[in-house]
Amino acid sequence: MKPGATGESDLAEVLPQHKFDSKSLEAYLNQHLSGFGAEREATLTIAQYRAGKSNPTFYLQKGFQTYVLRKKPPGSLLPKAHQIDREFKVQKALFSIGFPVPKPILYCSDTSVIGTEFYVMEHVQGRIFRDLTIPGLSPAERSAIYVATVETLAQLHSLNIQSLQLEGYGIGAGYCKRQVSTWTKQYQAAAHQDIPAMQQLSEWLMKNLPDNDNEENLIHGDFRLDNIVFHPKECRVIAVLDWELSTIGHPLSDLAHFSLFYFWPRTVPMINQGSYSENSGIPSMEELISIYCRCRGINSILPNWNFFLALSYFKMAGIAQGVYSRYLLGNNSSEDSFLFANIVQPLAETGLQLSKRTFSTVLPQIDTTGQLFVQTRKGQEVLIKVKHFMKQHILPAEKEVTEFYVQNENSVDKWGKPLVIDKLKEMAKVEGLWNLFLPAVSGLSHVDYALIAEETGKCFFAPDVFNCQAPDTGNMEVLHLYGSEEQKKQWLEPLLQGNITSCFCMTEPDVASSDATNIECSIQRDEDSYVINGKKWWSSGAGNPKCKIAIVLGRTQNTSLSRHKQHSMILVPMNTPGVKIIRPLSVFGYTDNFHGGHFEIHFNQVRVPATNLILGEGRGFEISQGRLGPGRIHHCMRTVGLAERALQIMCERATQRIAFKKKLYAHEVVAHWIAESRIAIEKIRLLTLKAAHSMDTLGSAGAKKEIAMIKVAAPRAVSKIVDWAIQVCGGAGVSQDYPLANMYAITRVLRLADGPDEVHLSAIATMELRDQAKRLTAKI
């Protein structure tokens, strides 16, 4: 069976509530359907399709003849719903001009035959992909499937209504307004509880109708991948199914409906669907829009795109409510109809979020000529959005954020964050600029995110706005890669949502922690618990009021194992008895309030469940290697962005100030600092991008040497650049009027954080000697 092919898995026994008189149907078809009774001895078999939440659909087979029957559901129905006579009419018109639909054969309005109206069409043998990720196909085939689908949609919207003789099939102009009104009424008629988001979304849609609400095209109304039948072997559409919601209206409503999966809320499971991943060969939304517009010969700048996306989610929420309403009445064909009660609200809330977003539906024209490390298409698009967001929202707020911490330096609020940060976070979430660091969530490569990290490095609080701040990024990496399902549910999800923060407890005050095997904090098993005892310091972020969980590295005693197999990582909630925050540690006099400070923490007989252990005993160093690789790339690329900002400040000051009767830049020493800064920035950027590329192509282990090299080179170079910038700015450079003093503290401490330079240099030398030994005949 081909992946996604129709077959036995799509069929089931007829549900009790949908059973009808098969003998009556057979007698009717013998009389009215040509060829149906050709095999007199053959038995009519009937099975019901599992798919479909609205009009029950059945597979009929008599001998070698196969058909599909669609009927109205039994019982009390919502007004103007389930009009299968319209389905039959539009399919007949489309089939007559060669548009890919199943051939409609017979319509019966006599409800005495099987209890409701019904129609019969030919059975089309092909592939239906129930899972939008289309597992089992190559990325190229997957892409071809999506391209063929959107080309078919463009073909539909290019048809002439008059030539189809479908005048009067829909009311015509004013479609969007009618849709909002109709679906509001449909929802209200089916609602079983009050959901404010539905009311708010309905009101927003009615107040933001497109100015041009007079487009009149034939639209499908429920155009999505699992309503398409593809050729058994080719990536070609051979039939479009389920025309129940078709009408004359605005074509962008179909295109938006097809694009829903790009924004589907993570908390809502897509029934019969896998998880959408941008790395899977599925074209981006902008690429599909470009193909659609090219096929129709229209401009790819689509006005009111956010309206149509919001409308689609409003309709989906209304459909979900209708499915659940029919479940309560006992006349729904789906076994999982009860699930729909809980998805109405998140769908409505997603629609509200999309209503506030601004979209560019045009593919960005980015020149990648000469790029050594090429971004993905999505990476290019996200980088453009991040740059715009930084310029429009983050950098203008820098002064306000800085003043907040100056004013609250000695207050109880000093570990909190100004309100503007929360506002910026909500805006970033709405724009889809959230959790960009995690490839499995963002769909970005390490090279993609490295360039984004460079941008966020230009402002000290920018990573936090995008939920890409350390140490949470590393901790989320750990939980994503190594956490159990229970650990992910309890801690990873709220971290990804930005509802809580975390800290990482590794370094200790009583040992040389640059050699991590020295770590003495003990993690001892006691029946179904572990007991933690020890001292930690430089636990970044522990002062944040939202810090709820710590990942602690400690020794699980087993001296029979190698020294790299004696340490483990464990989750410790910050409110666990025995966890005591001792004091904040300053960095060059800065307490780093914004990032939640750096704290000394003592663990005294701290008891946590054994299920809090991550991956297993003795796996601590294994986890550390997986955690630190990406984190070091992020740190180093942010310092590149920081260096760019410092160089900008240096150049601005050098062109503004006069000393000894000439501009500062005219003094050769300053000119040389500027030149040396540019050279250094380009060198460390290339080296860091090479490390990111190695992560993408070789994995963390294959990129070890490059990562160690950037960890030495980047902080060293940038510390010097910031120092030069301070020198050019004079006394102002170390004052609160410029960010340079804070920049220097950040970059200088990076020569210690995640391992001091000397440890990395020793590791680089060892790896280099090993690599050279492979090439030399002499034994080293």
Curated annotation (Swiss-Prot):
Signal peptide: none annotated. This is Acyl-CoA dehydrogenase family member 11. It comes from Homo sapiens (Human). The lineage of its organism: Eukaryota, Metazoa, Chordata, Craniata, Vertebrata. The modification N6-succinyllysine is found at K391. It is an enzyme of class 1 (oxidoreductase). CDD domains: ACAD10_11_N-like, ACAD_FadE2. Its main location: other. Acyl-CoA dehydrogenase, that exhibits maximal activity towards saturated C22-CoA. Probably participates in beta-oxydation and energy production but could also play a role in the metabolism of specific fatty acids to control fatty acids composition of cellular lipids in brain. Its EC number is 1.3.8.-. The keyword rRNA-binding does not apply. It catalyses: a 2,3-saturated acyl-CoA + oxidized [electron-transfer flavoprotein] + H(+) = a (2E)-enoyl-CoA + reduced [electron-transfer flavoprotein]; docosanoyl-CoA + oxidized [electron-transfer flavoprotein] + H(+) = (2E)-docosenoyl-CoA + reduced [electron-transfer flavoprotein]; tetracosanoyl-CoA + oxidized [electron-transfer flavoprotein] + H(+) = (2E)-tetracosenoyl-CoA + reduced [electron-transfer flavoprotein]; eicosanoyl-CoA + oxidized [electron-transfer flavoprotein] + H(+) = (2E)-eicosenoyl-CoA + reduced [electron-transfer flavoprotein]. Substrate binds at S514, G629, P630, G631, R632, G755. Belongs to the acyl-CoA dehydrogenase family. Widely expressed with highest levels in brain followed by liver, heart and kidney. The modification N6-acetyllysine is found at K177. It comes from the Eukaryota. InterPro entries: ACAD10_11_N, Acyl-CoA_dehydrogenase, Acyl-CoA_Oxase/DH_mid-dom, Acyl-CoA_Oxase/DH_mid-dom_sf, AcylCo_DH-like_C, AcylCo_DH/oxidase_C, AcylCoA_DH/ox_N, AcylCoA_DH/ox_N_sf. Homodimer. One of its GO terms (cellular component) is mitochondrial membrane. The gene is ACAD11. Keywords: Acetylation, FAD, Fatty acid metabolism, Flavoprotein, Lipid metabolism, Membrane, Mitochondrion, Oxidoreductase, Peroxisome, Phosphoprotein. FAD binds at residues 504-514, 538-540, 657, 727-731, 756-758. Pathway: Lipid metabolism; fatty acid beta-oxidation.
